C-alpha cells in the first residue's frame, strides 16, 4: 500500500474523532463554567455549550468548553500548583531535617554545658580561689569546643594541646606563687616541650584527645550533614517547570475539564509517566541521596556505641581532674626534672628563687567519676532511635516523589477504561517508565532530551557526593573542614528554614501513616521536553492498523 493511502486513512480517522459529537446536540458547559469560576476566574467569554476545539494548542482538539484564553489560564494555573506542591513536599522534608537538627543540637549543647558546669562546681569546691583565678583557662577550652562544633575552622587537637600547655603554666606558677613572676617565657616554653617526655598529667591528655576529638568530629559532621541535606532539598525543590513539561501537566490535570470529563480521574500509570518525565532530573539525585542518608545513619548509630556520646562529653572534667591530681602528686619530681632540663634561671637572667621543694597545698583536686544515669542512657537511646527512623523515612524521597504526587488524585488500578488517558475516558496502555533521566528516552508523555541534564540538579548531586565523603571521613575519626563550602551551606541550619518557610510539626511526606502531598510538582530547569499533545495514542494506532489490513485484503 502506498503512502498516499496511509495518509488518507489517518486524515479520515482524525476527522471522525474530532467529529464524534457532531451528530448530536452540543453538550452544556455548565459544569465547566462552575469549575472555572470556582478557581476564581471570570466567566466572560466562557462558552455556554461546547464549541469546536481546533483552536486548542495543548488539549485534544475535539468538541470543548475551553477557549484559547481559558486553556492558557488553566495551563498557568497547573504550573503554579505543580511547582507549589513540589516545594511543599520539599518543605516537609526540610521540616523533618530541621527538627532532627534542633533536637540533636539541643541535646549536644546540653551535654557540653552540663559538662562545663560540673567541672566548675567540682573545682570551685576543691580549689576555691585558686580555681577562680585560673577559671579562664577552662572556659577558653569549652569556648573552643563550642566554636569547633559550630563549624569554626580550627584544629581541635591543637586546641586541646594549647589548653594543656596553659594549664601546665598556671600550675607551675601556682606551685610557688611568690616566685611565679620570675618564670621567663623561655623557661615556660622549654617546660612545655618536656611534657611529651615527662608526662606531668599522666595519661589523661592522651585519653581525652583520643575520644573527644572523634566524638566532636562526628557530631559536627552530623549537624553539617543535616544542614547540607536541607539546603539541597530546598534548591532542588525550587527548580522551575519547563514550558514543555508544563504542557504535559496541563494535559494531565485540566484538559479533562475542557473535554467535559472533569469528574474522570487520570489513569494512574498515565500520571506516573508524566511525573517521572517531569521529575526525571530530580530522580537522578537518588543514588547519592541514599548514600548520604546511609552514612548519616551510621554516624547517628555511633553516638550510642561505647563510649557513648554523654560519657565522652562528661569525661572532660574527669580527665582534667585526673590530670591536675597527677600533676599535684608529682610536682616535686616534675619540677626537679624540668629545672634540670631547662635550667633554673628566671627573667632577665636572674637566678630563680623557686624552691626545689614546692609547697604542699592544703586544698587538692579529687579525681571525678562519671556514671551515666538510667535516664541519661534512655534519652540517648531515644535520640538515636528517633534520628534513625526519621532519616530512614526520607531515604527514598526522590524516587517516591512521582508516585506520592499522583497519590489520591488518580483513578484506582481496577477502574480499567474509566480513567483519563490524556485523550479521552479510556484505558491507558503504555508501560510505566523507570526512574531517572536515562529511562525517559521512550516516555510517551514527556519526551526529554537525555543529553541535556539540569545544571542546578547536577551541582547538587556533586555536593551530595562531597558531603557523603566527609561523613565517611568523620566515621574514621578524620577531621573534616566544612569551610570551603560555606557559600553552599552557610551557617547552622541555613537549609532548614529558608525564606521563613519552616514547617513546624508537619507530618512527613513519606513513611508510615503520613498524608501524601497532593497532585503535581515542579519540573527541571533548562531541560528539553516535548509535549505529547500530537502523539498517536495506542487506540488510534489500532484503528489505523484495522483500516490498513482491510485495504491489504483488496
UniProtKB/Swiss-Prot annotation:
Indicate how the chain sits in the lipid bilayer.
Lipid-anchor; GPI-anchor
Q: Its encoding gene is what?
A: gpc1
GO MF terms on file?
A: fibroblast growth factor binding
What PROSITE patterns does the database record attribute to this sequence? Answer: GLYPICAN (PS01207)
* Disulfide bond sites: 29-65, 59-255, 66-258, 190-342, 245-278, 267-419, 271-406
**What keywords sit in the KW lines?**
Cell membrane, Disulfide bond, Glycoprotein, GPI-anchor, Heparan sulfate, Lipoprotein, Membrane, Proteoglycan, Secreted, Signal
Organism this protein belongs to: Danio rerio (Zebrafish)
> Which of this chain's residues carry glycans?
490, 492, 494
Q: What is the lineage of its organism?
A: Eukaryota, Metazoa, Chordata, Craniata, Vertebrata
Recorded protein name is Glypican-1
UniProt-listed InterPro entries: Glypican, Glypican_CS
